[in-house]
A protein has these predicted regions:
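C-terminal cap/substrate-recognition subdomain and adjoining C-terminal extension
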Residues: 95-227
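Boundary at the C-terminal end of the N-terminal hydrophobic targeting segment
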Residues: 19-24
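Sec-dependent signal peptide recognition
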Residues: 4-12
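Short, Lys/Arg-rich N-terminal segment immediately upstream of the first membrane anchor
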Residues: 1-3, 26
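Alpha-helical substrate-recognition element adjacent to the catalytic core
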Residues: 25-127
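Compositionally biased regions
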Residues: 3-4, 18
């Protein structure tokens, strides 16, 4: 199935399963950044030791042009929405220091003006009792989003909390294995109280095109980085 037909099928399913947006025919669509729009593994692997704890996102936001790759199937999806007149927003858990560099990169790639706090939002996680929790749902509510595409559990939870339809972009294997824990706990460690799902369990979910929160799985085929 071609990318265009796949996108059309996903949209058709969406239209028949939840109410239409407030403005008929026009959708407000949100996208996460890391591992959804950008394969940013190399940025996070190369953070200098003195900028790791906590992560210096002012440094991170300046490195994408040199180290990150656009995930082409997601780019095609975003361009489809743009070309058909829908509203696109980017929402990331990064902090906003030097966010203009990320905005510039997105503007260049999508050929539309991307501006911090207008269609690019930085929503750092909030620390509560020693654990970090997403704050993206607040921005999703303000934007009255219809759909949100993301790779992480926190993206799905934020969308559901905001009353937005969540759609999972499956994180690339190289991203999971080389620098970051998987969602659903750490599936690489197998099942435990903290990690209720193992890698094989995820494959069962994905084969049915559904995630553990009931979210849709957006099917993409991307070869990833050369190494």
């Amino acid at each position: 199935m071609s990318c265009k037909k796949t996108i059309q099928l996903v949209l058709l399913i969406w239209f028949y399963t939840i109410p239409l947006a407030a403005e008929p025919g026009i959708l407000n669509v949100g996208f996460d950044i890391d591992d959804t729009v950008l394969f940013s593994r190399d940025v996070f692997l190369n953070i200098p030791a003195n900028k790791r704890n906590p992560i210096d996102y002012g440094w991170v936001n300046k490195q994408d042009e040199k180290m990150s790759l656009f995930i082409e199937p997601t780019v095609e999806l975003i361009n489809y929405f743009i070309n058909n007149g829908h509203n696109i927003y980017f929402i990331t858990a990064r902090s906003g220091e030097n966010g203009k560099f990320l905005a510039k990169l997105l503007t260049k790639n999508f050929n539309i003006k991307i501006t911090k706090n207008k269609n690019l939002f930085f929503c750092p996680k909030k620390m509560i009792n020693g654990k970090r929790f997403t704050t993206k749902h607040r921005t999703m509510e303000k934007l009255n989003l219809d759909l949100f595409y993301g790779d992480a559990d926190s993206d799905m939870v934020a969308a559901l909390k905001a009353g937005v339809r969540p759609i999972r972009i499956v994180r690339h294997d190289k991203s999971v294995s080389q620098y970051g824990k998987n969602y659903f706990g750490n599936t690489l460690d197998g099942k435990s109280k903290e990690n209720p799902f193992a890698t094989e369990d995820l494959k069962i979910f994905y084969s049915k095109s559904v995630g553990i929160f009931g979210e849709s799985i957006y099917p993409i085929i991307w070869n990833g980085p050369e190494k």
